[in-house]
């Protein structure tokens, strides 16, 4: 990953300090408020993004609910997705990530700071326990992000099927569902290029409980995907 190396080289003097502080916060999460941990992540993220020839172009920030206790559902393009959203989202959120990412350097510390949940897709019982915990925390006012595709798309800006089960936490907690359209996020780490790159993050209008309460989760999944796909097609560079 040439761009990650570029991020490190351009932040050579910052890396020891930033890495130590990130590890410290990740190991002592209960000493800091969620707001404090999130602002640290944004600061470290900003340094990495600037060093990596990246720019995040955010749209629809006004669509993020004013009250906490909502869920983001973005399309999934790659390892940079969460970092792109962290950089431009003004309010803290946590993540439900697949178990494999808990061993990825840097990301595992980011997720620790966010008090994220790791889900083992092969273990139904563990997955259900995670969903129940997310429901409880969303009802208590925490915000979460789930990638409804389950795994990143291998087709760039073309999302895969959105899995209906990913929306159970939202429907059970009756929270606002915020679709998020990511454009060109996969190019950050997955193409081998270090050219200047703009990643687009579009926060779409939320679906509130009154809108989806009579819909099946399969219908919700299809509608969220449709809105994201339409946004990508309107904004993608031909």
Whereabouts are the PLM-identified features?
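Catalytic core of membrane glycerolipid acyltransferases/transacylases, capturing the structured
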Residues: 21-25, 37, 51-52, 66-124
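Non-catalytic C-terminal accessory region of glycerolipid acyltransferases
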Residues: 4, 128-238
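Short acidic-hydrophobic, aromatic-tinged amphipathic segments that line or gate anion-handling sites
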Residues: 58, 117-120, 209
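Amphipathic coiled-coil/heptad-repeat helices and related helical stalk/stem segments
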Residues: 57, 78, 103, 127-131, ...
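Membrane-anchoring hydrophobic helices of lipid-metabolizing enzymes
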Residues: 1-70
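Residue-level "edge-of-site" marker
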Residues: 61-62, 124, 183
